[in-house]
């Protein structure tokens, strides 16, 4: 009896100890032989070398190795997982003809040489002259009478109104100023007979000099006295020609006197009534 009790107690103690401290089962000789044979004969390099990653089945080599064990290699295609892959591949096909079309355009846009050989001598090529319409010339001449120099905003506004470029307006004003200076030096400043509507692009319509106004002052003064202008139009007329109209009145001369003093002079002592 004592031997049976001791055997039962020893078996129970061994069973309780095994539950408290679980340990891995000891590897047998066959297990060691299994892992040693596979681990010794196959290296990681040999494993990856035997895989068919060099075959053109998929564009992504890591798709052929299923790490989760759900399927064999090559089960996922790049189009299902990356739908934009085809679009990027097709972009190269669209890009090649576009570049081929742009090549002749860049050749045509090259500027022509400014100097050409004519009879063995270099000759500079000039751009064609700009032909202004009568409306454009009239507007430019009216603006030149007001101011011979334009600021950048004024030049841009005038060019937009006339349908010209700012460079064309600037060159026109430069030519007009040079022509005016040349005529002024020669004493050939034209009068008001050159109206702004004149189509001659080289005519200078600057404000007239006081000497031109001296000849026309009596007729103009008599006309204003006989037929007075309306009240609304006379101030604007005098404001436009204020520096040119009032300046000759300060000069002395019988032709600058008012019509009343010029035609009704006081009689002398020996005058006959």
From Swiss-Prot:
The keyword Secreted does not apply. It comes from the Eukaryota. Pfam families: DLL_N, Homeodomain. Keywords: Developmental protein, DNA-binding, Homeobox, Nucleus. Its main location: nucleus. CDD domains: homeodomain. Residues 15-37, 188-235, 248-273 are annotated as: Disordered. InterPro entries: Distal-less_Homeobox_TF, Distal-less_N, HD, HD_metazoa, Homeobox_CS, Homeodomain-like_sf, HTH_motif. PANTHER family: HOMEOBOX PROTEIN, HOMEOBOX PROTEIN DLX-3. This is Homeobox protein DLX-3.
């Amino acid at each position: 009896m004592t031997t049976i009790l001791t055997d039962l107690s020893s078996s129970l103690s061994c069973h309780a100890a095994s539950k408290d401290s679980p340990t891995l089962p000891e590897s047998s000789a066959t297990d060691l032989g299994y892992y040693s044979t596979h681990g010794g004969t196959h290296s990681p390099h040999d494993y990856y070398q035997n895989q068919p990653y060099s075959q053109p089945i998929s564009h992504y080599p890591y798709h052929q190795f299923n790490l989760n064990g759900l399927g064999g290699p090559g089960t996922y295609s790049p189009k299902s997982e990356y739908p934009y892959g085809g679009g990027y591949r097709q972009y190269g096909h669209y890009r090649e003809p576009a570049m081929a079309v742009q090549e002749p355009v860049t050749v045509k846009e090259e500027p022509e040489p400014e100097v050409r050989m004519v009879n063995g001598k270099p000759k500079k090529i000039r751009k064609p002259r700009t032909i202004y319409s009568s409306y454009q010339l009239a507007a430019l001449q009216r603006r030149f009478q007001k101011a011979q120099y334009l600021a950048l905003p004024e030049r841009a506004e005038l060019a937009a109104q006339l349908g010209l470029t700012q460079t064309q307006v600037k060159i026109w004003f430069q030519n007009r100023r040079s022509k005016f200076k040349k005529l002024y030096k020669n004493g050939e400043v034209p009068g008001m007979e050159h109206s702004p509507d004149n189509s001659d692009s080289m005519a200078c319509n600057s404000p007239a000099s006081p000497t031109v106004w001296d000849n026309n002052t009596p007729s103009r003064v008599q006309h204003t006295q006989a037929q007075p202008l309306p009240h609304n139009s006379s101030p604007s007329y005098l404001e436009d020609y204020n520096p040119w109209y009032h300046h000759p009145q300060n000069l002395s001369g019988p032709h600058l006197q008012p019509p009343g003093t010029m035609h009704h002079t006081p009689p002398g002592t020996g005058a006959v009534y």
